[in-house]
Amino acid sequence: MKSNKATFFLGLLLVYAFCIMLIESRCYTNDDCKDGQPCPVPLACLFGSCICPWKSQSKLPICQIICANLD
């Protein structure tokens, strides 16, 4: 029984690590966040002093990036 719990939690940890890597790689390929750093917000990057959601597109005439100032 304990073996099953350990295997389950190990699998969960591996899935979590894979998701973090996937999110960070999306940050680097996103035009809005080319020079950004990975951050813990899902599908987001640091962009200047703001957090940019991955789906935002700064190339639009009116910038639609939703920014949150970092404290």
UniProtKB/Swiss-Prot annotation:
Subcellular localization, as worded in the UniProt entry: Secreted
Domain of life: Eukaryota
Official protein name in the record: Putative defensin-like protein 303
Biological process annotations from GO: defense response to fungus; killing of cells of another organism
One annotated Gene Ontology cellular component of this protein: extracellular region
Membership in a protein family: Belongs to the DEFL family.
Keyword Signal tagged: yes
Cysteines joined through disulfide linkages: 27-45, 33-50, 39-52
Signal peptide range: 1-25
Keywords from the UniProt entry: Antimicrobial, Disulfide bond, Fungicide, Plant defense, Secreted, Signal
